[in-house]
Amino acid sequence: MNKPLKLVVPLAVVLAQVACAANAISNVPGAEGPPAMLRAVSRGGSSPIQHVIFIVQENRSFNNLFMGYPRAKTQNYGYDTNGDKIALHSQDLAQDWDINHFSPAFFKACDPQKKLPGTHCKMDGWNSEGAGFGSPANYAYAYVPRAQIEPYWTIAKQYVLADHMFASNLDGSFIAHQYVVAAYASHAVDSPASYWGCEGGSQDTVQTLTAKRTYGSSIVACFNNPTIGSEADADGLSWRFYAGTIDGDGGLWSSYQADSEVYNGPDWTTDVINPPSQFLTDIGAGQLANVTWITPTYANSDHPGLNSSTGPAWVASLVDAVGTSKFWNSTAIFVMWDDWGGWFDPVKPIYKDYDGLGFRVPILMVSPYAKRGYVTHVQYETASVLRFMEDTFGLSQLGAADARAKDPAADAFDYSQKPRKFKEIPGAKPPAFWILQER
């Protein structure tokens, strides 16, 4: 719910337990709801972090954006299903075709050596995923030229880049965006046929994935799982989710559109904010929630097929807005791409459960306490950002993904250091540019 923005006592003891209610899918073999919620374990010492910002971009593998980055695990070639070695080619960030990135594409690209789909990957099936009209030969075997994404490389050089970051889920954006708020998606897989969430009612369903990674029955694409937002409400913390709209309703990347409690309650109009550029207006007015998610418009998303290249400038502008604000010394920013988007990557995902891990994706960690120019090789996943939120604010763990996920605080941050002065990111644009763009 809407509430005054709260100054958090680091590692505060949570006084209220949040009810754990999973979507009922008992007809799915091997399906389980989220486990009983666990208390977060205090990591000891005081954290200066009062605000966590989770910026979610779209559909890029680590190798696609950071091929050749110093000290990071990348590769300039791959193999196809015929055993042929394929040299990676450069591909503009702005393109008008897309690559299949749902679960069938994951299983094909992985090319498993074992019976269980998506495990023990040979990582040679990228030529089998399928791509849209106009795609070139060897479409997936590509990287974006550094000059087109310089703000991302600049942020990495100044802060932290993780080269063993994986999506918690193995499929596309609808499920990925449940993991960024709930670390769980009720065994759902891929995306609904029409609306992406509760707006579609009981007729809008999504398929499920069983424990054996076979396709199960369908469920309504409107979930009732605990989220970071519901925990924050229970603990008196403020949160905001900035997203675009489609025909006046939540956009495809608006996670809480598929959350029954939020979509059908007051939070939908008070804490789910549009358009995304409103974040720039809010922080300019001295307003920043304890927990913030920012999803982009289509044009600023980095998503293939949209023929736009403004994503790097958008992210740089968001980081600059925080860095030049009064909140800089109390903020941690995570910039993550939600799924691999069909692009080649050489690092095999480790099997964790029915839905993960997915392929490797980039994440940037930005804070005055983030290590400078650090490439971490620790294995992280989408839910690691939620684990950071939980451990920072003393919240409960939501499900299996965040329970197993590593908190980046111990590895990527140094709270004993004096907060670093912010250095503006080249390529950022003023708020007025983004406000006008969204009109």
Predicted regions and their residues:
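Bacterial N-terminal signal peptides that target proteins for export
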Residues: 1-9
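N-terminal pro-sequences and low-complexity stem/linker regions of secreted or lumenal proteins
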Residues: 21-439
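C-terminal motif of bacterial Sec signal peptides marking the signal peptidase cleavage site
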Residues: 16-19
